[in-house]
């Protein structure tokens, strides 16, 4: 087949642009007629952020939130918020927790749905942190999003070797009076175990016990492996080396987002391979 000439290519380009505009109009009308939410803007994100304790989720999530003007839904925070607001779901969750039970998947999914519908920050998309933890939860999340004519774009896992993670976490030191923090390896004090400013003794954080952390990591990997497998099959999983400096991790995240943007190219780019 002969290559398409420049004139013919431009004509095709113009025609496809008109078709894409028309398709967008029809999609908007169908969504409105069905009473569903309007399609999200192209510059939005719907993602899950996974990673073991200390991998850097707390550092990267605010950056993602700022870039996309989206909401960050950490399940623990969300649960406490719903309980504090005394919403129907919050009251139901509190009753279960007061009895020592575990909050059901249905309640958590309901809380996520309530945030997506009522939280104005979620118009730019969302970052889910701490959910799903099982394949069943992942399937129920997909079903809820499908009801909203949405689907996840990314499942990003911040990956780091357990031994490095243990040294990163257990090496943390703090000056109790001021809150100044140090690290035995990455940011050591000038004098061993002494605060640089006052010379007072530093202490290890009580929640940074190596044995306790190792147990948490065993649980994390056992829970996460099947969920990672689920999202690998759907094609939205990405793994990022979290042992890098935070700036390098952020650059890797931007690469994931740019790759998705390229994958969602125009009809013309899919036909011709040109953007």
Swiss-Prot record:
Q: What is this protein called?
A: Adenylate kinase
Function noted in UniProt: Catalyzes the reversible transfer of the terminal phosphate group between ATP and AMP. Plays an important role in cellular energy homeostasis and in adenine nucleotide metabolism. Adenylate kinase activity is critical for regulation of the phosphate utilization and the AMP de novo biosynthesis pathways.
> Mostly located where?
cytoplasm
Name the Pfam families on file.
Answer: ADK, ADK_lid
Q: How does it assemble?
A: Monomer.
Q: Where is this region: NMP?
A: 74-103
Q: Where are the transmembrane segments?
A: none
Gene expressing this chain: adk1
């Amino acid at each position: 087949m002969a290559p398409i000439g420049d004139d013919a290519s431009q004509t095709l380009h113009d025609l496809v642009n008109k078709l894409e505009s028309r398709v967008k109009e029809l999609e908007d009308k169908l969504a409105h007629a069905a009473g569903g939410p309007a399609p999200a803007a192209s510059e939005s994100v719907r993602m899950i952020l996974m990673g073991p304790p200390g991998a850097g989720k707390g550092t990267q999530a605010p950056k993602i939130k700022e870039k996309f003007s989206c909401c960050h839904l950490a399940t623990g925070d969300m649960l406490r918020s719903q309980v504090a607001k005394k919403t129907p779901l919050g009251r139901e969750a509190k009753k279960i927790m007061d009895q020592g039970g575990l909050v059901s998947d249905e309640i958590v999914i309901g809380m996520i749905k309530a945030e997506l519908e009522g939280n104005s920050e979620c118009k730019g998309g969302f970052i889910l942190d701490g959910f799903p933890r099982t394949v069943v939860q992942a399937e129920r999340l997909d079903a809820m999003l499908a009801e909203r004519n949405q689907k996840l774009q990314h499942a990003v896992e911040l990956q780091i070797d357990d031994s490095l993670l243990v040294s990163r976490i257990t090496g943390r030191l703090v000056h109790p009076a001021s809150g100044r923090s140090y690290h035995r390896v990455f940011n050591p004090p000038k004098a061993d175990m002494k605060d640089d400013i006052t010379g007072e003794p530093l202490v290890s954080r009580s929640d940074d016990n190596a044995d306790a952390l190792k147990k948490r990591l065993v649980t994390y990997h056992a829970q996460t492996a099947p969920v990672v497998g689920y999202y690998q099959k759907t094609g939205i999983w990405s793994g990022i080396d979290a042992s890098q400096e935070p700036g390098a991790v952020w650059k890797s995240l931007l690469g994931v987002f740019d790759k998705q943007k390229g994958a969602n190219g125009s009809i013309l780019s899919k036909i011709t391979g040109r953007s």
